[in-house]
Swiss-Prot record:
Cellular component annotations (GO), alphabetically ordered: plasma membrane
Protein's pathway: Cell wall biogenesis; peptidoglycan biosynthesis
Species, as recorded: Coxiella burnetii (strain RSA 493 / Nine Mile phase I)
Similarity comment: Belongs to the glycosyltransferase 28 family. MurG subfamily.
The organism's place on the tree of life at top rank: Bacteria
Membrane topology summary: Peripheral membrane protein
NCBIfam families to which the protein is assigned, alphabetical: murG (TIGR01133)
UniProt EC number: 2.4.1.227
Name the record gives this protein: UDP-N-acetylglucosamine--N-acetylmuramyl-(pentapeptide) pyrophosphoryl-undecaprenol N-acetylglucosamine transferase
Classification via SUPFAM superfamilies: UDP-Glycosyltransferase/glycogen phosphorylase (SSF53756)
Family matches, as InterPro entries: GlcNAc_MurG, Glyco_trans_28_C, GlycoTrans_28_N
Reactions listed under catalytic activity: di-trans,octa-cis-undecaprenyl diphospho-N-acetyl-alpha-D-muramoyl-L-alanyl-D-glutamyl-meso-2,6-diaminopimeloyl-D-alanyl-D-alanine + UDP-N-acetyl-alpha-D-glucosamine = di-trans,octa-cis-undecaprenyl diphospho-[N-acetyl-alpha-D-glucosaminyl-(1->4)]-N-acetyl-alpha-D-muramoyl-L-alanyl-D-glutamyl-meso-2,6-diaminopimeloyl-D-alanyl-D-alanine + UDP + H(+)
Record's subcellular location: Cell inner membrane
């Protein structure tokens, strides 16, 4: 049986694409194990069916004083921990899907001379992947032109969940749809307070509440407050702290209001749905803005910076879309044209090149 070690952690934007690949690999009877970080989100999201190895490492950026001085020692410790795991498992290939666990994991792959493939989900590569690119056999990218083109760079698209890839096309879902404008609000798996607040402000002053229906993922922190506020403003609303059925949510929606993490952008393209992106302003290298541009330039999305975002802007867009379903459908179809439904298979195809004969 062939063996692959997947390295991914930290955020859903790294973990969910890796899970999509891992599940397909398991269907192909590959022995898949996972390398993550102690205390990371991967401890909650990676199913028990995938053996999960955890090392100790924290993000490097923003450290000062003693913490900065200790980082080299902590990196060495993490690399040694990853090294032991790799030597024990003996994978044919290591697939790095991002998160700060990828740094020590990738270095350990290089030390053990295990083939390393990295995948960059964002349109602007992170520091870790820029370093690991020099050691990797292949550099896979979710968006075109993330890395300078050379023989090692392959645009695979970003892997998304199978149930999203298999959803009906926009014209099937949306062409005959009537009734209120259905707005899906997402702030990432942790929620986004500024989006939550601006949405409430916009909807509370919306003149015709019967024209709007909302499904709002708030994050745990704001859940109770947002739920009570929707009751006050008399808008038809479903409020969840976390949405596990994303296929159901995207299928329900006419319009998505969200951040512009790589996973969200590619899920929206895979499904084919109109969107308003509010990029996280503190994302490293402003990568969320560049992710969103991928859809905006194709006429599939609107971008509003958080700095300039007002409830008046949102209300104006909602009014326009509520009266113009043809535009919603056109944006959804434009998004779907950019989808890479075969992304999982493209990633696996590169891994297969290093399978050992067993």
């Amino acid at each position: 049986m062939n063996r692959i070690l997947i390295i991914a952690g930290g955020t859903g934007g790294h973990i969910f694409p890796a899970l999509a690949v891992a599940r397909e690999l398991r269907e192909q009877e590959v022995d898949v194990q996972w390398l993550g970080v102690k205390g990371g989100l991967e401890e909650k999201l990676v199913p028990d069916s995938f053996p999960l190895h955890l090392i100790q490492i924290k993000a490097f950026r923003g450290k000062r004083g003693l913490q900065q001085l200790l980082m080299p020692l902590r990196l060495v410790r993490a690399v040694f921990q990853a090294y032991r795991i790799i030597r024990q498992f003996k994978p044919d290939v290591i697939l790095g899907m991002g998160g700060y666990v990828a740094g020590p994991g990738g270095l350990a792959a290089w030390i053990t001379r295990t083939p390393l493939i990295i995948h960059e989900q964002n349109s602007i590569p992170g520091l870790t992947n820029r370093v690991l690119a020099k050691m990797a056999k292949f550099i896979l990218q979710g968006f075109p032109d993330t890395f300078p083109q050379n023989r090692k760079v392959i645009t695979t698209g970003n892997p998304v969940r199978t149930e999203l890839v298999k959803m009906p096309l926009p014209q099937v879902r949306l062409a005959a749809r009537r009734g209120p404008l259905r707005i899906l609000v997402l702030g990432g798996s942790q929620g986004a307070r500024s989006i939550n607040q601006k949405m409430l402000a916009a909807l509370s002053s919306y003149p015709r509440s019967e024209e709007i229906a909302v499904w709002h993922q708030t994050g745990q922190r704001d859940f109770e407050f947002i739920q009570k506020e929707y009751e006050k403003i008399k808008i038809e609303a479903k409020v969840d702290n976390f949405i596990s059925d994303m296929a159901g949510a995207y299928g329900w929606a006419d319009l998505v209001v969200c951040r512009a993490g790589a996973l969200t952008v590619c899920e929206i393209a895979s499904v084919g749905v109109a969107s308003i992106f509010i990029p996280y302003p503190h994302a490293v290298d402003n990568h969320q803005f560049h992710n969103a541009r991928f859809l905006e330039q194709a006429g599939a999305a609107i971008i509003i910076s958080e700095e300039s975002l007002t409830e008046t802007d949102l209300m104006r867009w909602f009014e326009q879309f509520a009266q113009d379903r043809d535009r919603l459908l056109t944006m959804a179809e434009n998004a779907r044209k950019l989808a890479k439904p075969e992304a999982v298979q493209r990633v696996i195809a590169q891994c297969k090149k290093f399978y050992a004969a067993r």
